[in-house]
Regions:
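Leu/Val/Ala/Ile-rich N-terminal alpha-helices, chiefly Sec-type signal peptides and the beginnings
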Residues: 2-71
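Short, flexible coil/linker elements and helix-boundary hinge sites characteristic
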Residues: 5, 28-32, 104-107, 129-130, ...
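Alpha-solenoid helical-repeat scaffolds
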Residues: 10, 26-29, 41, 45, ...
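Non-catalytic, well-ordered alpha-helical scaffold segments
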Residues: 49, 53, 85, 89-93, ...
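Polybasic, proline/glycine-rich intrinsically disordered low-complexity segments
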Residues: 49-52, 61, 113-191, 207
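Alpha-helical repeat scaffolds in large eukaryotic proteins
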Residues: 56, 60, 64, 96-104, ...
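N-terminal interaction modules that seed assembly of large macromolecular complexes
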Residues: 58-108
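Long, hydrophobic alpha-helical segments that serve as membrane-spanning/inserting helices
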Residues: 189-205
Length: 207
């Protein structure tokens, strides 16, 4: 992974913009998702929101009033940045597979190869946002492995977001003994956020 000089501002400016924009959008009418371009935008923004709000929420809960102070520590910042991108990478996979599986099951959409096209495009676009190249390459390989094994007919209803929930548990820069105590809460926090995304997708789907 490349070396980045990180600060609180660098890490959170784009991240919290996504989070706050998602909150704002909750109060305005949402248009239907009628094209693959709109689906791509949905996958990217919702994956970013879920990964960021669950990671930062967990860190804030565990660190309490010391939360902000830790962001002056370069070693900790690198750990948070590493966690952020790795969790996001798995979240992207989960939501891509879920949406295309749901499309196939409910609308008889058959061109599931477009899932790979959209997923790879999102990752390539993230280069400009400093997503580390080694994570991008590893994520593409992992996606290909999952792609070869996926059952498109059932994925959407078969614990589709467990991998990203486990990713938060794995990558969050919290002491292992504390994470062990928090395991159920951590996993549930991710699944609950995905439940919101699933509901929105089902309501907005206009294919």
């Amino acid at each position: 992974m490349g070396k980045y000089k990180l600060t609180w501002k660098d890490l959170t400016l784009r991240d919290f913009r996504i989070y706050l924009f998602a909150l704002f959008k909750a109060f305005i009418p949402k248009k239907k998702i009628k094209s693959l371009d709109e689906l791509e935008d949905f996958i990217q923004t919702k994956s970013a929101w879920v990964s960021q709000v669950t990671l930062y929420g967990y860190l804030k809960t565990r660190m309490g009033t010391r939360y902000v102070l830790h962001f002056e520590n370069d070693v900790f910042m690198k750990s948070v940045n590493l966690a952020k991108w790795n969790i996001y990478a798995v979240a992207l996979q989960d939501l891509t597979f879920f949406t295309f599986s749901y499309l196939k099951a409910t609308t008889n959409y058959e061109d599931t190869n477009r899932a790979k096209e959209i997923f790879f495009k999102i990752l390539d676009d993230e280069i400009s946002n400093k997503m580390p190249l080694d994570i991008i390459e590893n994520t593409k390989k992992n996606f290909d492995e999952r792609f070869q094994k996926i059952n498109w007919d059932t994925y959407h209803s078969d614990l589709p977001f467990n991998p990203s929930a486990l990713s938060l548990y794995k990558w969050a820069p919290i002491a292992e003994e504390l994470k062990t105590l928090d395991r159920k809460i951590v996993l549930n926090s991710v699944i609950l956020k995905w439940d919101v995304v699933k509901k929105e997708f089902q309501e907005r789907l206009g294919f």
